Structure formats: structure tokens, C-alpha cells
Amino acid sequence: MMSSRLNAGAMAVPAAAVAADVVDFGYAAPMPPPYVGFDPAGMGGERQLFQHGGACHGLYDGGLDFSAAAAFQEAATLGVGLPGGNLLQSLAPPAAAAATPSSLQMPMMMSLPGLPATAADVYPFGGGGFVKREDGPVLDVVGGGGGGRIGLNLGRRTYFSPADVLAVDRLLLRSRLGGMGMEMGMGMGVLGLGLAAAAHHHQPPRCQAEGCKADLSAAKHYHRRHKVCDFHAKAAAVLAAGKQQRFCQQCSRFHVLAEFDEAKRSCRKRLTEHNRRRRKPTAGGQSSKDSPPPPPSKKGTDASIASSYTSCDHHKAAASTTTASGVSCLQELADHHDVGGGHQAAMAAAPPPTLSLAALPPQEEDDEDEDGGLGNVLMMQQHHQRRRLQHDGDGDDDVAAAAAHHHLMRSLARQQQQHRHSSGCSNNNDGDDDDHNNNNNILSCSSASDQQNSSNNNNMHFFEVDFI
């Protein structure tokens, strides 16, 4: 804007003067008069203020002091002390001369965009056309990098032309706007992400089964995490993602029904691995389904053995009971004596009958020989007793006593046969152990009636049987 205004003011100058005096800044400058005082060291060298071409670049080597430039600017504005100070007014027409002091002599004050308008940041544009940047971040256009008030010439101040200042201001404005835009964009992005995350966080989890969409805010953590309600987590078939699926407890996700075995709630793959970890591997490497059944427990075998022993004990107890009941057979003899009637007083006066019965031997003979042993001996004794009674010629009382004794012996023989049958199991197991005891089995039986008859007839009816 400023350059266009300066160009508009310079159009009123004649073409020859403009062609001779126009420099790179776009406005006409007075003739270069020699003057002293630009060097801060007071060297007094004569320098041309404005030169055409590359001579003007000597102004930016750091030898120009801003205080001297300001004094020169005021002198040029007032037209005092400098020859040719009113050169523009003399060369320009009256209209242009009237407009020139307002546009060139009055320094224009402006602030850089994007910076606070303070006294330190206000820079005069106009007569001298020099700008000094003391504070704030400044980009070094010549060097292409960033810098402050120190330029390429280290230790000296750097001054820029108005065009350079405008370029720097544009870069500053662009960078600041870009930074602000980036910061705003990042801020909005972060804010947007925060809002989105907050919205996502506050959105309640819902069941992923189609048609359910149950709110799982008050459900268990497991159901909230896997987004499935309690009902669909245990359902046999669930419509999810357009397919009939089932929720796997091992995988914690939905699988198609083909991956499950029947009504299992864990997929086949994970269930196989789970069972393999829990069960011990077999010796043959067979699976649990093909493995043979486990052997019967020792407890059952012991129980069966104990039961067999118990049964044998029962048989032994029964045998002993039968043997003990043999004692009651003597009572039967007493009953027969009562029937006879002749020996009631004798039986009352006689001492009670006694019977000593030792342990019976096991059955070692064959089945055909069941009538041998004690039965044969008893029969032989009864036969000899009958012959003896007949030879002596005793009365009917002796015959009745002999018959009762014969009945007693037969009952004892019958009980012996029953004992053999009942003690069969014990004889098979303990046959070898009882061989050495066979010689000690003695059956002795005595009767009070026999003792009475022996006292009368001087005969002993006491017999002993050894089983060999």
C-alpha cells in the first residue's frame, strides 16, 4: 500500500528526473550531497547516502548509526543545512510539490501485524526509509535463518530496508498465523479427541447379540468387557453378525455352531486343550475314550475275601453249633428211657450224661465213603453189644437200653455226616494244615446207663475212636 502511494506521488515528476533518480525503494531521492557524521567513530569520511545499483548496499554493513540517520532525516524534512533539501519541491510541479511534504516529509508510523502496538515496536517509515528491529523474534531474511537483533555481522546491529521489513513481517505473520492455526487445530483436535473419548467412555456397553442391545452398565465386569448379556452368554444359539453362533466360555467370544460338540458351551478346540491339561496322559498314548476301564479297586477284592472268610466262619459256627447240639441228643436218650418206663428211677438217680466231643476231622475220603469212619465203628460196637446181651440172656430192660444206645449212636453218626458237608469249604483251604492234627481228633462218649449196665454186668461201654 505504501509503495503504491509513493509511486503515485512520483508519477508527477518528469520522466528524465525519475529515470535518473529512482532507486530500488520505489521513490525518488535527493541528489547525494556529501556530509559528515554518519560514522559513529567520527572518522569524517564522505559517503553518498543513496547510490544507484549495488552502491546502496553499503548502508547495511553496520556502519550507519540510527541516531545520525534520525538527525539527517529531520534535517532533510525541514530543508535546513543540506544543499538540495528542497530538490523535490523545485523539480515537482506545484500540485505535486504541495502533495510531496505530506507524503514524504511526514514520517508514517505503523506497527507490525501480529505484535502489540508499543512504543518500542513502532517504526518510522518515510524520509530516510530505515527500519530498526530491536526486540521480538525476527527472521534474518539474508541469512535465511532465525535471529534477533544480531545479524550476519556479529556484534553489530543490522538494519533492514522497508521491503525487507515487509517481507519479514509477512513471514512473521504467516508463521504466527500458521502456529496459531496449528495450535488451534491441535487444541481443537485434542479437544475433539477428548470429547470423543469422553463420549465413548460415557456410552454404556451393550450386548452385541442382534435384537438385544441390553444395557450392561450394571452387569458384571465380564459381561461388560465382552459385551454380552448373561442370557446370551448361556444361550445355545444366538444370532450375532448375521450367523447362528454360540458364546464360547473358553475364548470369550462367539463361534459358529459347527465348532461346538452337541450342547457344549466351549468350542471343540479349546475344550480338547483344556481336558489334555487337566487329565494325566496314559501310558499307551491313547485318548481317554479309548482307554481301558480301570482295574477293580483293592477295597472290593478285600471285601470279597473278607466275605468268603465270613462265610467260612459262618459254616464253622454252624458246624460248632451242630456239634454242640449233639450234646442235646443225650436228652433224647433220656426221653426213650422215659418211654420204657422201667428205668425212670434209674435215670433220676444216675448222674447226668456227659459227652466230650473233640474237633471233627476234615472230609478226606470220597463221597462213597461217607458211611465209613465213626459210623462203621459205632455199628460194629452196637453189633457186638447186641450179641453180648443175647448171650448173657438179660431181660427186656437191657434190650430197651441197648436200643436207646443204638439210637443215640446213629444220631451222632448222622450229625457227623452233616458236619462233613458243612465244613467242606474250610477243608479245601486248610487241608494241609489239618493233616498233622488228624491223629489228635478223639471222640469219647459215655453214658450213665452204660456205666450202670457195666456195674451190673462188669462191662465197660466206653469207646474211643481215632481218625487216621
Curated annotation (Swiss-Prot):
Segments forming SBP-type zinc fingers: 204-281
Compartments, record wording: Nucleus
InterPro entries from the UniProt entry: SBP-like, SBP_dom, SBP_sf
One CC-aspect GO term: nucleus
Positions with biased composition (Low complexity): 438-458
Residue span of motif Bipartite nuclear localization signal: 264-280
Molecular function GO terms recorded: DNA binding; zinc ion binding
A Pfam family assignment: SBP
Residues that, per the record, bind Zn(2+) 1: C207, C212, C229, H232
Annotated region (Disordered), positions in chain: 270-305, 354-374, 405-458
Comp. bias regions, Acidic residues: 363-372
Domain notes: The SBP-type zinc finger is required for the binding to DNA.
Function: Trans-acting factor that binds specifically to the consensus nucleotide sequence 5'-TNCGTACAA-3'.
Protein name in the entry: Squamosa promoter-binding-like protein 5
Organism: Oryza sativa subsp. japonica
Gene coding for it: SPL5
